[in-house]
A protein has these predicted regions:
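Short hydrophobic alpha-helices and adjacent helix-cap/hinge residues
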Residues: 1-111
Length: 111
C-alpha cells in the first residue's frame, strides 16, 4: 500500500478484514470499507448498507418466490438503511482527529 504512496485506502469487502485492518494500521494508512466488522476489528471506519436489514429484505423476496411469485415481476430495491461506524482507537493510533460532527452522525463510535 505504501509502495504506491497512497494516503488512504478504501477496501472492497473481504473475509480478511482483520488482516487488512492490521496491515493498514502497520503502514499508517487510514482505511475504510463496507462491512461494519472492519471497524470492529481495527479498521478506521466502515460505511455501507446495514447487513441484517438487507438480509431481511432479501428473505422477503425468497418467501414471495417460494409462494409462486415471479422474480421478473418484483421491483428492484436499493438499500435504504446505511450504517457508519468509526473506530476512534484506530484514529488516535494514526494521529487523526475525527471531527465531532462526524462522530455525532455515526451509528457507532468505538472508543
Amino acid at each position: 500500500m505504501r509502495k504506491e504512496r497512497a494516503d488512504a485506502v478504501v477496501v472492497q469487502g473481504s473475509l480478511a478484514s482483520k488482516n487488512t485492518a492490521e496491515l493498514a494500521l502497520k503502514r499508517r494508512l487510514p482505511a475504510a470499507t463496507v462491512p461494519r466488522s472492519f471497524a470492529e476489528v481495527g479498521g478506521l471506519m466502515s460505511y455501507g448498507a446495514d447487513g441484517p436489514d438487507s438480509f431481511r429484505r432479501a428473505a422477503g423476496f425468497v418467501v414471495k418466490i417460494l409462494q409462486g411469485g415471479k422474480p421478473a415481476d418484483m421491483p428492484v430495491e436499493q438499500p435504504t438503511k446505511f450504517e457508519l461506524v468509526i473506530n476512534l482507537k484506530t484514529a488516535r493510533a494514526l494521529g487523526l482527529d475525527v471531527p465531532l460532527h462526524l462522530q455525532q452522525r455515526a451509528d457507532e463510535v468505538i472508543e
